[in-house]
């Protein structure tokens, strides 16, 4: 700060004459020394522009008086120990008003020195507050966080974000001091409205929210942004900030929070569900220009914000207002909006030296994603927050997992993949709503995984009247219809019909032991990676994210190299979900399984013979596989990087064994196996050539047919001899029927078949796993089966997904194989 002498105005009065040897000690006036670069009418009513005035300079005015002594001929003003202003006075001046402009915020001790020549007397210190929205005048916010939130910290290079909502300070009594910000990289502030057509807003709070917005927008143009609830945002006295500060409300808390956690990113989220109507006017560039300019001014006014988040629900339509949405033009308008916002933020960065982020929360259904070219938009964006929740809810009575990663176990393959026709015979248009489908669709568009953040639900959605008697699959509530939204009181965590806070679910449905309380049973769909609680007696069903499912989301994010996770909304969590976000993101990827190799030996050939050898490799993770073959000197290979190779035996004078090694790699892990190739001399009797037999499974009491493929180089007739343990019986021959005895648990036993040409014999061994499954009946075409019923058919165990009769296991989607 340069000392300002030229523009200083000094009001003074000469109260006494002759000079004394020492200056008088000045006293500062009693009035508070408070200034602000953003002036807020903390007691007023009116529009946003009437209540909030921003300026670049504050005018400091310091009234002082020296009640005794000879006065002085110059003065100095200090903020703490920093000299910020000085000037000359008529000799003997004993009172006055020092005025000067100032451009830097802070909270200081103010001192005025009255001087006679170079000898000065300093006043007692007095607090001066020069407020600005960067929060530099504030002390770090004192926190009041639920101790269930661990001190995890953030994860370098990853996103752990959460929404904080403006209205949370009311009934939920959740202000900024309660945010576990030490564990967050991002806070998304909900919500900043756009002036203009907002018909959807009339549907909530009997129109009061809409009327409040009309007041806030009274002096603004359509498509400018404002503060929706000034009392909550900037007027109300809040914990942790002096009630007399010039700027109050949760904004003052957020400013102080940045003093405690300067690396935390806080973004205003513009729009939201019932505030999305004006976005549909952005197909008009003039409207976008108005909006972008307004956002720039908003960020210049509220300096604690680190960018902007756009929550347009939804480009193309299917948002809260059924009359809005242009599937053709909304998508290009969205991309243009991102480009124009990024250009504006770049300008702001050049002006301020700061960095600003541009993010967007987006719908996660296939029908939402297909309307926007996110690959084109991503170049302007830092992150895309995929709202992978709200897949099902009490807006209708169809139950399902509202935030599952994958399809529920109750869905057919066609329902999951979006193929075939629905119950009305109408062709399905796209895959079921799941987190995985959303992420995969975005990746298929070409979106960089490092820009994708997966959504976590810190709340549950629920229904009444979900009864087991109505379930298509007994015991699976997702196959029973609801009968209206979940009901309850706010004390039970139900703030609106059909929605319950996670912390209420944990306390009132899951319980401390985790096994369910108050009549609820705790369920988890392994296939969907989705949690639910269900009260069979009263029919209450709640689908939600649990710590287990959130950890699975974190592992999914790691597996697919996503940026991280974010949650809606932080006031509904007791710390469990945010802790689980950290645990999932630091737990590593879902463990990769190494490929398996099925080929076995020895392989018998004669000199010069060519034999095909197949690695018979598979991978449980369905990873693409690569192959590498290495043959001992003498063996010739047709290739060395294919799944099967043709091996040519050398000419030998006597029986010789050679090693043939194959390595199968899934991109991360590899498996290596060596097979012995036995080469017999030409003219000598060559042993039979036997193709290795793959391992099989068979249910106890059931039979399986095993075919042995063997040839003899001389064309001799072959005989087969089977060696089996007591658990099996077998009929000899190249095609044998193996019958399993009863076992008390799954049992694996070896079976050896000896193939002989009358001179030489070759053994090949494979494993038979006997499944303990005698309790399952054989499938009967005339019998009715319901979800969960198991049967044996063709030596395999199948489980019904839902009601079925006459549909053959292995050929119909209603059955899933339990063993093969």
Curated annotation (Swiss-Prot):
Optimum temperature is 50 degrees Celsius. Gene3D superfamilies: 3.10.50.10, Carbohydrate-binding module superfamily 5/12 (2.10.10.20), Glycosidases (3.20.20.80), Immunoglobulins (2.60.40.10). It catalyses: Random endo-hydrolysis of N-acetyl-beta-D-glucosaminide (1->4)-beta-linkages in chitin and chitodextrins. It is an enzyme of class 3 (hydrolase). It holds the Pfam family Glyco_hydro_18. GO terms for cellular component: extracellular region; membrane. Its EC number is 3.2.1.14. InterPro entries: Cadherin-like_dom, CBM5/12, CBM_sf_5/12, Chitinase_II/V-like_cat, Chitinase_insertion_sf, ChitinaseA_N, Glyco_hydro18_cat, Glyco_hydro_18_chit_AS. One of its GO terms (molecular function) is calcium ion binding. Optimum pH is 8.0. Coiled coil: none annotated. Keywords: Carbohydrate metabolism, Chitin degradation, Glycosidase, Hydrolase, Polysaccharide degradation, Signal. CDD domains: ChiC_BD, E_set_Chitinase_N, GH18_chitinase. Disulfide bonds: none annotated. Residues 1-21 form the signal peptide. PANTHER family: CHITINASE (PTHR11177), CHITINASE 12-RELATED (PTHR11177:SF317). Belongs to the glycosyl hydrolase 18 family. Chitinase class II subfamily. This is Chitinase A.
